[in-house]
């Protein structure tokens, strides 16, 4: 059985060589993430060019995702490598541009002293160090250390429950987006999205640089993003549940419930939902995952996530290939236990369906009734395939498209196996070509039942209006 839940791997120093990238693709990497919070353009371009060379030589549609640094707040540098803070210590954050020491450190946001108040909690390094604001004196925020720890330069700052008036895009983000357009990235994973206007701002920048065909995945990382999830989902092409910062900004115990709710909303929209952060975190150091991590990945699959993601496990861990292999095994085992018919019955068609809704729903129902081996979907923009897969059919969906960009973008959609095809000029040819491609790729064999969907006029996005069910017969092609 073909794996339906897709896997994203973050590239980094641990997978620098073309040979390692080839091994990742063979093992099951569907998309490669480039984390622009680290490294410069030259470093990322080197990895990107290697990946493109490898995926082209293997003829595999591996998508590329540029993950922005986003409008975050960090501490700046110290006069030593690191400092140690203990509970009860007094420690100061300042918006002045000074070199830090054991008593104070500068922050990257120049207006932080205007937006915090006495009594507020400030978390540093994903909450490993906790401060309580005592008083504000000019540009200095004097705090008491509540949870001590070791601090080094450039660690993140979170202030739970406080809306900080940061811009949606920084100058670095704009430069990075331009780089993504110039180098043909498939997706922008936009960090710290708080409202739909943030997504629209990114679309404007993409349009300015000629990147209208790059899709936006909004990362939900704070309470404001959670509160505005419906409008963000509407404005975006996909959602990432970024559980690292999200679990710092809101109580960690609430994250599993939010994960389920966000995935459920994404399912209804047909847009891909990525579950990310610390999924197999122990495999950065160890060759096997913990039992809790195995359960975490499996439960994301049971929730219906489109993708699961590896971050530090593949970017900088000691066991990148083993981490991916472990994730593939967990996903496949979890998928085998899913009752797709029961799941399909839960995913009702929309209250006011259009023709496309009815056709894609009927495709899945017909495939279930006939126990079809595959659904074959001719799609110009990729939307038809995504709309089919929101109903989570038991069989895989072969998506035929004439655009290489669309082929790669479909690589992160649940259950979709995208193929590139030439131009066609008749519906009969669409149907026969769909079967030919599925046969060639080994998805079906002679005697299998398939359900095919397409639309007329040919080549027009959103025109899906035809269904055909047939037995595969090579002699009739």
Task: Tell what function each PLM region has.
Residues 1-477:
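Non-catalytic helical/linker scaffolds that mediate oligomerization, partner binding
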């Amino acid at each position: 059985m073909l794996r339906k839940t897709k896997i994203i791997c973050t590239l980094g120093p641990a997978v620098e060589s073309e040979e390692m990238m080839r091994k990742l693709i063979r093992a099951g990497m569907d998309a490669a993430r480039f984390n622009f919070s680290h490294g410069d353009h030259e470093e990322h371009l080197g990895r990107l060019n290697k990946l493109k060379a490898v995926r082209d030589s293997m003829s595999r549609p591996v998508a590329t995702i540029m993950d922005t640094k986003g409008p975050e707040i960090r501490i700046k540098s110290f006069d030593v490598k690191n400092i140690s803070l203990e509970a009860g210590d007094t420690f100061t954050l300042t918006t002045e541009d000074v070199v830090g020491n054991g008593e104070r450190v500068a922050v990257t946001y120049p207006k932080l002293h205007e937006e915090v108040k006495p009594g507020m909690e400030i978390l540093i390094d994903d909450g490993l160090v906790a401060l309580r604001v005592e008083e504000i004196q000019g540009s200095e925020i004097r705090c008491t250390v509540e949870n001590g720890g070791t601090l080094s330069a450039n660690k993140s700052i979170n202030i739970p429950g406080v809306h900080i008036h940061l811009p949606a895009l920084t100058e670095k983000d704009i430069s990075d987006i331009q780089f993504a357009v110039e180098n043909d990235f498939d997706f922008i994973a936009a960090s710290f999205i708080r409202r739909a206007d943030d997504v629209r701002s990114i679309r404007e920048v993409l349009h300015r640089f000629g990147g209208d065909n790059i899709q936006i995945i909004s990362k939900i990382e704070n309470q404001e993003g959670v509160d505005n999830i419906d409008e963000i989902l509407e404005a975006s092409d996909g959602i990432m549940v970024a559980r690292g910062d999200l679990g710092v900004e809101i109580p960690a115990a609430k994250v599993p419930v939010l994960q389920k709710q966000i995935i459920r909303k994404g399912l209804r929209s047909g847009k891909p939902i990525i579950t990310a952060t610390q999924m197999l975190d122990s495999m950065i150091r160890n060759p096997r995952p913990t039992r809790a991590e195995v359960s975490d990945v499996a439960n994301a699959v049971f929730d219906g996530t489109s993708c699961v993601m590896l971050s530090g496990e593949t970017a900088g861990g000691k066991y990148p290939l083993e981490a991916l292999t472990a994730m593939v095994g967990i996903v496949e085992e979890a998928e085998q236990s899913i009752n797709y018919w029961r799941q399909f019955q839960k995913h009702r068609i929309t209250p006011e369906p259009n023709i496309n809704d009815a056709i894609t729903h009927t495709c899945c129902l017909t495939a279930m009734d006939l126990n079809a081996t595959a659904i074959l979907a001719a799609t110009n923009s990729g939307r038809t395939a995504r709309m089919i897969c929101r109903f989570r059919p038991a069989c895989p969906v072969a998506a035929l498209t004439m655009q290489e960009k669309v082929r790669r973008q479909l690589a992160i959609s649940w259950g979709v196996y995208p193929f590139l095809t030439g131009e066609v000029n008749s519906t009969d040819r669409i149907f026969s070509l769909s079967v030919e491609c599925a046969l060639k790729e080994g998805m079906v064999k002679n005697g299998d039942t398939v359900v095919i969907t397409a639309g007329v006029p040919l080549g027009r996005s959103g025109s899906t209006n035809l269904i055909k069910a047939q037995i595969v017969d090579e002699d009739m092609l």
